[in-house]
Amino acid sequence: MSENLWKKALELFAGGVNSPVRAAVKPYPFYVEKSEGAFLYTIDGQRLIDYVLGYGPLILGHAHPYVKKKIIEQIEKGWLYGTPSKKEIELAEKIRSHIPSAEKIRFVNSGTEATMLAIRLARGYTKREKILKFDGNYHGAHDYALINAGSAVSEFNVIISSGIPTSIINTVIVCKYNDLDCVEKHLRTEEIAGVIVEPVMGNMGVILPEQDFLNGLRELTKTYNSVLIFDEVITGFRLGLSGAQGYFKVIPDLTTLGKIIGGGLPIGAVTGKKEIMSNLTPEGKVFNAGTFNANPLTMAAGIATIEVLETTNAYDIANKASKEIAEELDNSLSKKNFKYTINRIQSMFQFFIGISKVTNADDARLANKDLYVKIHEKLLKLGVFIPPSQFETIFTSSSHSDEIVNLTIEAIHKVVSEI
């Protein structure tokens, strides 16, 4: 059945999909009928253990009963008002209570919108035009982000997307991740409005900051009066309730959030210092608006998700699953005659074959992508779904029980022994 739908999709959608990475599953994407817990159920009758989890939002797994209950309760009250609602206050209070940089908040509808607005805010606040980003960091699908980006941009060998004016390209400076010398060189010009960074890279596989990198960014941006923006769309509420900034104890000026704070529904947010956030309309002159901003349905899902994270051992379960799977993958790969490395933090990890250390995007691009795809395809046949792209992240959730983890480990041992 998936094959028939794929043929229709090719007639209806550009490239057959509505987000490029979905086309990376070969020979055609499988189509999902329903999801629950750690499982996807395809229209072809296959049950898959899911380690993609919507590319990050579903830290509690699919269709969590409490989140579902709160979504249904809100649907019965209406799902779009066009006015403020109590729910936006409740979710904002939860975010502010946990995220150290979140003095004020503006909700939007995606991570892309959030980073686009954060960049605009940095430029409006500093009256400078240039932005510094890092090679392989993915900040969504807008013009200022699609320059040396990660994720599907790298998968399809696109360094700079077509359609971006040269005038915009010239305002974006790119440094290697973990390279503070490059950052200081460009900040010294005092032309940089802001530095935007994934504190943990999640769209070139998983790449961790070296020991002094984030602290170095904090000190340099203070010295040269640039805005430090942490893109925590992935790491926010995944590395813990306080995100990467709490985990690494480095507080940025602005933070972008998304994914988990919407409980699986579309969301984004910009949070940060009052003096910067006050530049947003209607208080200031940096414009932002949105029909669906802070819609009550997404707010309800986000509140429910954070409530579960606050009151249960969800993080412990998700982190344990990630640790055990990564360790057993390491055991299997160590028996093979090739170099490899596994980068992991909390409930997110990725493995790279053919290279022994990955600290930036250039390293990640040297990995054996063909062998990664073979492992993905063999695991899929055994009912385990990891990302089809080397440049995505393997996520775990609180729905990945010991039994599910053990089934996954069995599949990994079998697949790795055969490659």
From Swiss-Prot:
GO terms for cellular component: cytoplasm. It is found in: Cytoplasm. The modification N6-(pyridoxal phosphate)lysine is found at K259. One of its GO terms (molecular function) is pyridoxal phosphate binding. It is an enzyme of class 5 (isomerase). GO terms for biological process: protoporphyrinogen IX biosynthetic process. Keywords: Cytoplasm, Isomerase, Porphyrin biosynthesis, Pyridoxal phosphate. The keyword Cytoplasm applies. SUPFAM superfamilies: PLP-dependent transferases. The keyword Cytoplasm applies. Its cofactor is pyridoxal 5'-phosphate. Pathway: Porphyrin-containing compound metabolism; protoporphyrin-IX biosynthesis; 5-aminolevulinate from L-glutamyl-tRNA(Glu): step 2/2. It catalyses: (S)-4-amino-5-oxopentanoate = 5-aminolevulinate. Its EC number is 5.4.3.8. Belongs to the class-III pyridoxal-phosphate-dependent aminotransferase family. HemL subfamily. This is Glutamate-1-semialdehyde 2,1-aminomutase. It comes from Sulfurisphaera tokodaii (strain DSM 16993 / JCM 10545 / NBRC 100140 / 7). The lineage of its organism: Archaea, Thermoproteota, Thermoprotei, Sulfolobales, Sulfolobaceae.
